[in-house]
Amino acid sequence: MTDEEIIDLFFERSEQAIGELAKKHGRAAERVVRNILGDRRDTEECLSDTWLGVWNAIPPNRPELLQSFVCKIARNLATKRYHAGTARKRDGRYDLALDELADCLPDRGGVEELLSAKELAEAINRFLDTLSYEDRFLFMRRYWYAEALPVVARMAGMSYGTAAVRLHRVREKLKKQLLKEGVLI
């Protein structure tokens, strides 16, 4: 079934929509959630919440890229669950990925946090547009999908060391760009 047909099922409020969505994009959403939470039960619960979130979001939304839409909802829910401390077991992959980016991101703080988060997201998106396909792939798989570095390297067809060095250079470029734009002080 095509994404457009699945979206049409959501607009018709057909319960078949969730089954078709899970069949087509469930593995991608599960991978995102599992990489963040690390626990099978938490992953299953978060996926159930994801399907409900998509059900509530379509309509009114009609996403152009359904898999990205689903993975974004899944990632946001998994991140909230992770930070709320409800994950019973954490394997540290998500913490490690966030620690790698710590020098590139402004400190959280106070009233400005919400505004600076939007500004930061826009700056990172502009930065990603400047990267080569390979560097953007590495960055997104490591920091958006929270994939382990050996997995990202294998997916990119390069050695662990090469991937690690390239990601380090990308983080340095990101830090420089954020400093230049005044997002990181």
Regions found by a protein language model. Name each.
Residues Q16-A17, A28, A123-R126, Y133-F137:
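Pre-recognition alpha-helix immediately N-terminal to the DNA-recognition helix
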Residues K24-G26, I36, M140-A148:
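Short helix-capping/turn signature of helix-turn-helix
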Residues E45-L52, N56, E64-N76:
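Structural recognition of an alpha-helix C-terminal capping motif at a helix-to-coil junction
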